[in-house]
């Protein structure tokens, strides 16, 4: 069965039994298509909605008549935007017309409406120099939803919710007395008949006449205390506006504005589509029995006779003939079914109206009126165009309301069905385009208010469109969306797969969505409608589980925002599966029986078996072959891209597969990537669609190749396409982006051919890790609890070495005392520290730096200080004016080191755009080569993660009979309880494939079976069980048992020990408690908490305990004195009073308790009020500020840090690695001499 398959430049041996019928769509089209829709249609829709803006007298009219994005005037390219920290955007120019009705004067102008962020080819945005992704949001679709609860007597009480896109909700509920109530916009409930009366049915008789005789309706009428339309209107007004004097007119206008004003109530296209689907007569009466003859009102012919069953086809005919009310009999009851009076326009109009953009059902009364009054084709078209908002109303109409009430009444008799809110037919995706459109609409409506105000204020003669329009609110709302919306996220750029997954993510969180706290289990659960649309595996662990999902591989989002998945259609006449593919939404799928992708077919597409296993909505059935409706396109159609990259996924437990999918996204790009020997065949598609590989724009011949660029001569016109390659750029997460050409000179390339490899790709396939020779064997306890034992060879040969690039920036600002200056001339710095600094004061490229080294020399003017008498004397003698500056150079932070790979300088003089107050900005990029080391986290693709516990010399590793040592030893106990057996199969197949020199593709759910793996092992000349004798590298003796050995694909994850390890001696302290801050980012200390204190108490270590609670924590004076004593080599003094104790006393004083502190002999101990009092006599400052005394901290120096502690702002800008070596110890011993009074000290 194994056969070669060509993927890009590599041939893989595939175990797939299925021919791929459907082509996988472009994996980031969710982003690209949605943004394109916004530019083509979305913007126009908003302008149409807001047109025209009139002033309050109706005299001035402002209209937007067209717009264009000025693509020729884009200021910077994508690369330049990243360098300069600007937004990649194009100016939006809008054509505006202002009409003055009095004078008839028309003014037209093109108005600039701000820069509009553009999407890059990769589906991302560059905002302020950072690459961001707009995540698609899964929200409840507008529509009518029905549900029921069972009361204590076992009776079903039905309820309904009518949800618009924006506007007032309607909620129906039934109480145990069978009275149906309605809540309008979450107010108090009213009997539903009051709403019906207010809509036009005044008397009880009219209501019963319209809706038919029904028990619950009668019960509700009895409860209803209004009898006329006017009373009903007043009753509703009292509920909605309590406390205001009710009048019929105000009630009428209130209801009109609540429901029938398109600006206040918007169903959106989706809402209208869902309404028409739910409330249509046809679906509700299909397969029911007619209670009366059903007659076509136009022709008078009988469509269905009394007592006949109404078929699906007849039901559609009834609906489209304009019949809106049908009586059907259910168990001797006659129930009236009322629809919302929408028909298919195609059954009335035979000529082509595709250019009118009417794709929904249309409102019958309006259509009927047009067709009665006009006969000419052109006139009809003209009228349809004119009345398009009446034919397809954006707001709710009375017929919708009556239909929802009728549906509620019919549910008790089994007419219609209740809805499942977690069904993907009832949840839709809001992608970039729609989110942007909503945001833009907010900005425009704010602008509309401003325009109306300006129309009334300004002189109507001289007014121009430009003067009326204020673009600030529009620009602000767009900026706010991209900068701070929950759905605009900093792109996850660790490797190409994480980028791709981020763009395909579906989030139920965000504005208008759920919140983590309120989301229950049902929302997070896997639902049968997710099949082929959302991945059941890939979702985060933790509080967001199930709320953030990933789009399945073949899924698409349709124009309404519903997720569709492709199926092959089954020709029922012939009973064969065709190659025709249909994309189907979740609610359409519910009516079908669907066969698996790997169901056996003969060469003509007929089912081989008589009985076929199929998926019905939420169960698996076995049916005869002739009943199957559809068939899956591919075995991997139900999972996402990351999950489809796990070989033998079918043999892994789901929770481990989830970890595997998530951890692949954290794999760091390695120095030498290697495509997996055992892949799944999707690696190439994922790499190409992720957008990190340069692809040929046109067919041609490669003319020139270097490390930096590739040139291709086009076949079409002989011109040359040049492709610049990225070299050692920093990604959002600090990993390294680097491209290497993979084509040769004179090579022929087609359009779309991959020209170069990027980070984590190998020959155009995604390559996140390395193929490693490993064995499942315990070794001296070093792989206890998932630890890994690795060979020194992995370190020596740079197998798991990755490059990380960090960016540091220094800015020279204007201060109150004068401008800061970037210079080489820094006070108190020896020539040795400046050896790599050039004459401008900036480090040279290629220099090797360690923590504490200067990157950019910078001095800040100091305030004039009061001079002492000695200093004044010295000044008078030597006549030297002090240089009053202090060193504020940018230095390499603690624990960082590396090589300078790039320096960028931006200055005001060169015309670079800099933030206000900044004159010069310098950015340095430091690259580190990180070899694999103890403490690094690694994993396979099956959720088998571990931490490196020991690096063993190569000669000590267990070795094979042919002398090759293993590279990694894994614990065999990590497999059985975790049930991820896929890793074992991968190891066996990799063992065979490596020997045969194959690369293998084993697609998920359609991969290699056990007999095939055994066959491969035999072919490679290995034992069938994949085990081999291993020898101990230390003694050379064989181990007692044979061991499973093979090749496993192993990833190095982004949790590197170098980023986590951290130590502090002294550093910044919290302002209030005076305790050291916490965490590596703040250069904090280790927390010694309550339980640790108990441990010392239990041990009786009194002195250690006292020291930890005072001088090592918040005894301000004690810690300075202790430090002095250590420096001078004296004994450590007694601890003082910790700050926490003073805070406690202050709290007691706040409770009006007078607390005094007494010593042993009853003398009162005086507590100094503030830090300044205490530290007056100290001449060492261990917070690392320049001046020897601890300055009182000014409020503006304090900034909030993340954990809610206060951090001294000086810490951010100044160097906090206090180098105590610099302190001159002799001074402390000897007192001060005259030479100490020069300005540098």
From Swiss-Prot:
Record-given protein name: DNA-directed RNA polymerase subunit beta
Q: Which Pfam families match?
A: RNA_pol_Rpb2_1, RNA_pol_Rpb2_2, RNA_pol_Rpb2_3, RNA_pol_Rpb2_45, RNA_pol_Rpb2_6, RNA_pol_Rpb2_7
Q: Could you tell me which PROSITE patterns the record lists for this protein?
A: RNA_POL_BETA
Q: Which InterPro entries match?
A: DNA-dir_RNA_pol_bsu_ext_1_sf, DNA-dir_RNA_pol_bsu_external_1, DNA-dir_RNA_pol_su2, DNA-dir_RNAP_su2_dom, DNA-dir_RNAP_su2_hyb_sf, RNA_pol_bsu_bac, RNA_pol_bsu_CS, RNA_pol_bsu_protrusion
GO cellular component terms, alphabetically, are: DNA-directed RNA polymerase complex
Q: Which UniProt keyword terms apply here?
A: DNA-directed RNA polymerase, Nucleotidyltransferase, Transcription, Transferase
Q: E.C. number, please?
A: 2.7.7.6
Q: Where is this region: Disordered?
A: 1195-1219
| Similarity comment: family membership | Belongs to the RNA polymerase beta chain family.
Q: Could you give the subunit structure recorded for this chain?
A: The RNAP catalytic core consists of 2 alpha, 1 beta, 1 beta' and 1 omega subunit. When a sigma factor is associated with the core the holoenzyme is formed, which can initiate transcription.
Q: Which gene encodes it?
A: rpoB
Catalytic reactions of this protein: RNA(n) + a ribonucleoside 5'-triphosphate = RNA(n+1) + diphosphate
Record's NCBIfam families? PRK00405.1, rpoB
Task: Please tell me whether the keyword Isomerase is annotated for this protein.
Answer: no
| An annotated GO BP | DNA-templated transcription
Which function does this protein serve?
DNA-dependent RNA polymerase catalyzes the transcription of DNA into RNA using the four ribonucleoside triphosphates as substrates.
In the record, what terms sit under GO molecular function?
DNA binding; DNA-directed RNA polymerase activity; ribonucleoside binding
Q: Which domain of life is it from?
A: Bacteria
Among CDD domains, the record links this protein to: RNA_pol_B_RPB2
Going by the record, the broad EC class of this enzyme is transferase
